[in-house]
Amino acid sequence: MSSTGKFELLCLENPLLDIQGTGDEKLLQKYGLKPNDAILAEKQHMDLYQELMEKHDAKLIAGGAAQNTARGAQYCLPPDSVIYIGCVGKDEHAKTLEKANKEAGLKTCYRYDEEQPTGRCGVVITGHNR
C-alpha cells in the first residue's frame, strides 16, 4: 500500500455497496422492515439483497459516508489529492466499488477479506420512502 503521491485528504471507513430497488409494503413486511427506517441487517435480512437485484430493478451504487465524501472531494480538488482506505470482500461487489472510484479519479487502497463479503446496504424505495 505504498504511494509515491502526496495526498491532501485521507478518508478511512468501511465501504458499502448500496443496493437500491423499488418495492412495496408487502416486501417490507416480508423482511420485517418499516418505511423510512434504518437497521443493521440480521440473518433474516440476507436474502433481501439478492431479491432486490433479481426482482426489483436494483441499482448498485458505491456508498459509505467516507467513500462518498472522498469521491466528492476528489471531484473538487486537483488530481491525486484524495486517498480512500477501507476493507472489502474478494467479490464482485468490491469490483463495482473499485470501478466507481476509478471513474471518479479516486485513489483507493482496499484490504481484501477472504472470508467476509463486501458490506452492503439494502434500500427499499416505496413511493417517497427509503
Go through each PLM region and give its residues.
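Glycine-rich phosphate/adenosyl-contacting loop at the front of the ribokinase-like
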Residues: 2-83, 92-95
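Short beta-strand/turn micro-motifs composed of small residues
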Residues: 13, 86-88, 126
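Short, hinge-like loop/turn segments at secondary-structure boundaries
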Residues: 28-29, 100-103, 126-130
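Short catalytic-loop micro-motif centered on adjacent basic/acidic residues
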Residues: 83-86, 109-110
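Short, electropositive alpha-helical surface patch
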Residues: 86, 90, 94-103
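A glycine-rich helix N-cap at a beta->alpha junction
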Residues: 100-117
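Conserved phosphate-binding/catalytic loop of the ribokinase/pfkB sugar-kinase fold
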Residues: 109-113, 121-130
